[in-house]
Each structure stands twice: as structure tokens, then as C-alpha cells.
Amino acid sequence: MNKSELKKKLTPEQYRVTQEKGTEAPFSGKFVNHHEKGMYTCIVCGRPLFPSNTKFDSGTGWPSFDKAIPGAVSQVPDTAHGMNRTEITCSNCGAHLGHVFDDGLIDTEKRFCTNSCSLDFTPD
């Protein structure tokens, strides 16, 4: 999809986050306190990213997952804003999803910290 098509498909906030690597305000997203069973998908291309059983409450204000579907998420070094982080993007379309940190649950020690507006949801 080109920029014009994306701007028609996405809300201004979804575009800012997924295409310009923005971050939504903590505790503002619709999936922060979302607990339905199903699949979280990329808002841009629809690729399945995170099963609902991998979601946990990290207390950070953003939807957090301890693992992604294998091959669904790419990890990219991010040194913006003077920080050393790892950006996560949709491996299909390159949409910015958030960041992954090594402070998650005991099983994986990963916290995929995502922006709600970069996600969609398909219930089981």
C-alpha cells in the first residue's frame, strides 16, 4: 500500500504510530485491558502476530505479550532518543508495533510492548 492508501485506511493515530514510529499514550489504547480469547493482528496488513494466551498485564499501560507467532515479528535495533532498544515491526508489511524488552515473564523473559492502535483483534 502506498502512503495515500494507508492514510485512507488508517486513523491519523494509527498512521503516526505504524508508519512514523510513534507511541500512543500509556493506558489510552483499547487493548490495554482487553481479555477476550483470539488473535491480535497487524492493523495494516492483517497478519496474525500474538495469540491472546501470550498477553499479560505488565503494568506499563501498553498491551504486553511474552511471545509472538514465530516469524510474524521482526526485531530491529533502535537508538532513537538516546536509548538502546529493540523495535518490533510486522514482518509482513513493516508496520511499527512497539518494542521488545528483556524484563518479561519468567518463561520467556521477553515483553513485547505494543501500541494498541497498531493492532486489530479477531476473536476465537
Which stretches of residues belong to each language-model region?
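A short Gly-Trp-Pro
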Residues: M1-D124
